[in-house]
Amino acid sequence: MRIVVTGLVATYPMGGVSWDYLAYVDGFRRLGAEVLYLEDTGGWVYHPQAQTFSDDAAPNLRYLVEALRVIDAPADSWSLRAPDGVQHGLGLDAVARFCRGADLFLNVSGSCWLRDEYRGARRTAYLDTDPGYTQATLSAVAEGCASAEQQFSADLIRQHDRFFTFAEHIGAPDCRVPMGDLAWRPTRQPVVLERWPVHVGPSAARYTTVMSWKPGGAPPVIGGVTYGSKDVEFMRFAALPQRVPVELEVAVGGAVPRGELAAHGWRVVDAYECSTTMAVYQDYLRRSRGEWSVAKQIYVALRSGWFSTRSAVYLASGRPVIVQDTGWSAHYPTGDGLFAFRSLDEAVAALARVEADYAHHCAAARAVAERELAAPRVLERLLREAA
């Protein structure tokens, strides 16, 4: 079996991003597939230290090569098209041959342009990792009010023949993510459990999370309603540190009101410093006591069922996870190692339950990852549905 997996590892050279996309490469290879990692966004790449985009892909290319080594990917199993049009790694002709013979072209996050050279796979699947935003784009086109960027994105989406989404609750009566005219199939983040062994060392005193405060660009609009991001939801729970006897830390990027959060008792650290490489990111999560986090407002308000890729690897590390409910609690077991909350009181109660039997909930967290998120289970289902 031949599979093309796209992603944003070089475009956003940060540890958490790399683990997300390379789990597909690693997971499919472990199922016996021959996998090509392809990255071609048609745009510039991000330089996190400078906090800006650039047409210089040299440091991003070096990062990608190192990231692929972490998962033991063969040297000839990747290709990156830089902003200047140069194809690094596997050349364009070889990429075209691989794509023509592929059983599946999996466009994760819709990150890759579908150039002529990338076509010809038996199935071309779009994987929506940002539910609500994707559907807002499609809705804008349907309503005749799309920007040029939205029109381009919608046209790209419709060039696929299978459609997967992290909106796991889509189609449920209480889910407000519009289905539109596409047959969305729910999926979830795969975790290669062998890469995330249970951390048996001493755990930190702090519950942590890693997040972006507020994305740039225009906010998504669906049905005339404008939706926000994590900044909106986080402030609903700003007083949480004053209600619990444990320390809470947020590793966050963006225009964060650090002083205001610190006044409420939050420990605020820089997200990039916790995610410079895959190893640094993994170590930060594994040294945490567990995760406490909110979701983007659009995920919550639409009852999308989105579940965090980051929470998935906290669980795999044997770290209890307490995260805001987006509708995901209808699809995952809760109450042992994994807790959903909708209100401040529920968040307080969940932290108390974990602290009352911490060792039990650590073991239960890993068990949830093994049952629900193991790469073979997730990816074999995706392959069946893609076929």
Predicted regions and their residues:
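Residues at the C-termini of beta-strands that transition into short coil/loop
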Residues: 39, 128, 164-167, 188, ...
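Hydrophobic anchor at the start of a short beta-strand
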Residues: 33-36, 124, 207, 246-248, ...
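Extended catalytic core of nucleotide-activated donor transferases of GT-like folds
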Residues: 4-174, 275-280, 284, 300-302
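Residues that mark the start of a beta-strand
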Residues: 1-3, 123, 206-208
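Conserved catalytic-core segment of nucleotide-activated headgroup transferases in glycan assembly
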Residues: 171-290, 298
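Catalytic binding pocket for nucleotide-activated donors in carbohydrate/polymer assembly enzymes
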Residues: 7-23, 29-45, 50, 55, ...
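P-loop/Walker A phosphate-binding loop and immediately adjacent motor/lid segment at beta-alpha junctions
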Residues: 117-132, 179-198, 317-319
